[in-house]
């Protein structure tokens, strides 16, 4: 995208697709800012010109959340405004989030504009479910796929923010938060804020992080494993019913139980399991 700005090879429609929390909408805004920057540096906005400073208030940047504005009338309003030239920018940019939520009629209304857009109009569509978008729309967009962010990258970013905020956080706690976020930096930041709120004035330890985030006690997993090994169906059902009564999401319980089994395998096969297993010292000893 930087190269397209440098070489002035700008498409009229882009689609950013990938899992939630991976930066699609944020990237769309960063890209839009760079497109209308008066003095871009290597394809990146300068942050100093009038267009950069007034980006959030610019009438030439139009955002639409298709999750709640998905009717044909919503899109027709956009189509009607397309013919009005930008006020003080090079491009008039439409950012449509969760675009897969648009109705069939809304997609049809959008299609004609995508086929013959004015030179100054750019559409940036963001979605978590590209397969739900009509091929007629996809074929007219330059596509970028966003992937889950690695645990290490998320952890490093959390560490940077913790240092800026002068938070004392154990490295293992940050790694657990990063893993729990499941590739979503946005979710990781939310979890870190949650942990910070419950540990004001105290160091955020790994054990405290487990308590705050409500990690299931390993005794439950241990009892479940014993019941499975002994083929005790009654005990398995009893444990599952207890999880339901506590309001536990069983699909998440399965994920956590799988992680527990992974930790057990690591204990049996790795000499440095203590460093890579996401478990408190007390629980780790119990697992051994």
Label every PLM stretch briefly.
Residues 50, 57, 77, 90, ...:
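Extended, largely alpha-helical regulatory/partner-binding modules appended to the mid-to-C-terminal parts
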């Amino acid at each position: 995208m930087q190269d397209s700005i440098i070489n002035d090879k700008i498409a009229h429609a882009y689609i950013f697709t990938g899992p939630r929390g991976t930066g699609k909408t944020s990237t769309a805004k960063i890209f839009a800012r760079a497109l209308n920057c008066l003095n871009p540096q290597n394809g990146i906005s300068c942050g100093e010109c009038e267009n950069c400073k007034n980006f959030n208030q610019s009438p030439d940047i139009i955002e639409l959340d298709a999750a709640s504005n998905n009717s044909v009338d919503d899109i027709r309003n956009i189509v009607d405004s397309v013919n009005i030239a930008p006020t003080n920018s090079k491009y008039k940019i439409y950012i449509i989030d969760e675009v897969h939520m648009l109705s069939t009629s809304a997609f049809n209304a959008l299609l004609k504009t995508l086929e013959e857009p004015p030179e100054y109009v750019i559409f940036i569509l963001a979605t978590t479910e590209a397969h739900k978008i009509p091929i007629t729309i996809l074929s007219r967009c330059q596509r970028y796929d966003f992937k889950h962010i690695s645990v290490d990258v998320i952890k490093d970013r959390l560490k940077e923010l913790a240092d800026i905020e002068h938070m004392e956080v154990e490295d293992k706690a940050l790694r657990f938060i990063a893993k729990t976020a499941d590739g979503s930096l946005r979710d990781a930041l939310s979890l870190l804020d949650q942990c910070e709120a419950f540990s004001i004035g105290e160091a955020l330890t790994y054990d405290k992080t487990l308590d705050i985030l409500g990690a299931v006690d390993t005794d439950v997993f241990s009892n479940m494993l014993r019941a499975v090994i002994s083929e005790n169906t009654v005990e398995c059902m009893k444990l599952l019913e207890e999880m339901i009564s506590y309001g536990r999401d069983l699909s998440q319980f399965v994920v956590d139980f799988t992680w527990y089994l992974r930790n057990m395998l690591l204990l049996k096969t790795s000499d440095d399991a203590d460093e890579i297993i996401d478990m408190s010292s007390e629980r780790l000893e119990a697992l051994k």
